[in-house]
Amino acid sequence: MAKALQGVMAALLTPFDHQQQLDSESLRRLVRFNIGQGIDGLYVGGSTGEAFVQSLAEREQVLEIVAEEAKGKITLIAHVGTVSTAESQQLASAAKRYGFDAVSAVTPFYYPFSFEEHCDHYRAIIDSADGLPMVVYNIPALSGVKLTLDQINTLVTLPGVSALKQTSGDLFQMEQIRRAHPDLVLYNGYDEIFASGLLAGADGGIGSTYNIMGWRYQGIVQALREGDVAKAQRLQTECNKVIDLLIKTGVFRGLKTVLHYMDVVSVPLCRKPLAPVDEKYLPALKALAQQLMEEKA
């Protein structure tokens, strides 16, 4: 079953309205837009989805809406991670109920948990997911949890774990993980090194910028399948030009602004305390949206 999880998975954004409430209609349009651009699946409720500034009820509502739009059409992975094991279990149960294909969880953070506590946290979530495969989410830059290679090797061999989302620039470690676990589904997490991650052994990727240019990442996959490394590098360079701009604007708010100009997202706002895009970047983001729409067409 784990091999069905391979591919290009957009880390789904969560649209909000001017009152900072969930914009369900924009969310539905965004799901349909992603399906239309040919991505293999959605990773719902993660960092890109601003999960950690949402209530548990809101996170469940997002899962429900996404399932209504996409279940059976593409692979659906629910990120259910929180600092609380009980809350993560509740979200895992919801993911199972709504028909998701897998669950994922970031390592619990903020408190200095022992490694055995991390393992127990994952075991509990896996139990509540009732048969859904687990995607361990390693993102040390945001979680503050610096797992060693030995600890990663232990986590990915827990019963019920089928995949790892490796959001790290350490490509040597990516290759070490692949060598140690040839059957593990391994996702590259940093969009700017997607092609390099595939060459280091990743099966696919989970990324935020796939929301606006998923076809480019699919093109990188296809180029490498055909042995055309030069084409993969060219496509990665084009992606990275976009990422350069988004880093300046703030990635999530920049993506929402581009999608607003594409008529996908009604309001290009993140949830506070994240601020709106600086107006000086709006012309560049509008031009990017136009460029991508023409390219997609």
Swiss-Prot record:
It catalyses: aceneuramate = aldehydo-N-acetyl-D-mannosamine + pyruvate. The keyword Cytoplasm applies. GO terms for molecular function: N-acetylneuraminate lyase activity. One of its GO terms (cellular component) is cytosol. Pathway: Amino-sugar metabolism; N-acetylneuraminate degradation; D-fructose 6-phosphate from N-acetylneuraminate: step 1/5. Aceneuramate binds at S47, T48, T167, G189, D191, E192, S208. SUPFAM superfamilies: Aldolase. Its EC number is 4.1.3.3. It is an enzyme of class 4 (lyase). Keywords: Carbohydrate metabolism, Cytoplasm, Lyase, Schiff base. It is found in: Cytoplasm. One of its GO terms (biological process) is N-acetylneuraminate catabolic process. Belongs to the DapA family. NanA subfamily. This is N-acetylneuraminate lyase. The gene is nanA.
